[in-house]
Amino acid sequence: MSNIVWHAHAVDKQSRAEQKGQKPLVIWFTGLSGAGKSTLAGALEQALAASGKHTYLLDGDNVRHGLCGDLGFDDAARQENIRRVGEVAKLMVDAGLIVLTAFISPFRAERELVRNLVGEGEFVEVFVDAPLSVCEERDPKGLYKKARAGEIRNFTGIDSAYEAPEQPEIHLLNAGKPVAALVDELLTALRLRVLID
């Protein structure tokens, strides 16, 4: 690696952000399967796009079709999954985008790794907090049922740990609130932190 040099470009992150008229950042949704991460990230992206923001949504299921298609679900593979996504998110922030991510991302250390990759003030952790019982009841993909039947191993919340964020920038309780109300909470919190206008 000592022969590989990072090339600085004349058009930098600040130039790209000014061109887009926004502050680039990563909005990192974390929580159990079925907590509502993808739904909320998608709804927030729609609201941001409607207000003229330049966004991109990285979804946990989608990256497993390509970028992370070679990875399994043991702890080491989950860590590598988040590392790769963090590197992609960093590049997208450098491009001046508001990047939304929807990943279980069960381990604090990996979420911290991404926070440090992206940089100070450009990472917003959103804990979508839904009780396990609510997530199991929703079970949109039937995964909890399979995990309880022993058909899926290393399933977060069942036989693999989820380390809840200790100090997320935004903590959303999602046990039945309408999506629109939660998106309003998100937008308000982002505006209060002067991350969006």
Curated annotation (Swiss-Prot):
Pathway: Sulfur metabolism; hydrogen sulfide biosynthesis; sulfite from sulfate: step 2/3. InterPro entries: APS_kinase, P-loop_NTPase. The keyword Phosphoprotein applies. Pfam families: APS_kinase. The active site is at residue 105. It is an enzyme of class 2 (transferase). The keyword Phosphoprotein applies. ATP binds at residues 31-38. One of its GO terms (molecular function) is ATP binding. One of its GO terms (biological process) is hydrogen sulfide biosynthetic process. Gene3D superfamilies: P-loop containing nucleotide triphosphate hydrolases. Keywords: ATP-binding, Kinase, Nucleotide-binding, Phosphoprotein, Transferase. Its EC number is 2.7.1.25. It catalyses: adenosine 5'-phosphosulfate + ATP = 3'-phosphoadenylyl sulfate + ADP + H(+). Belongs to the APS kinase family. Catalyzes the synthesis of activated sulfate. This is Adenylyl-sulfate kinase. It comes from Aeromonas hydrophila subsp. hydrophila (strain ATCC 7966 / DSM 30187 / BCRC 13018 / CCUG 14551 / JCM 1027 / KCTC 2358 / NCIMB 9240 / NCTC 8049). The lineage of its organism: Bacteria, Pseudomonadati, Pseudomonadota, Gammaproteobacteria, Aeromonadales.
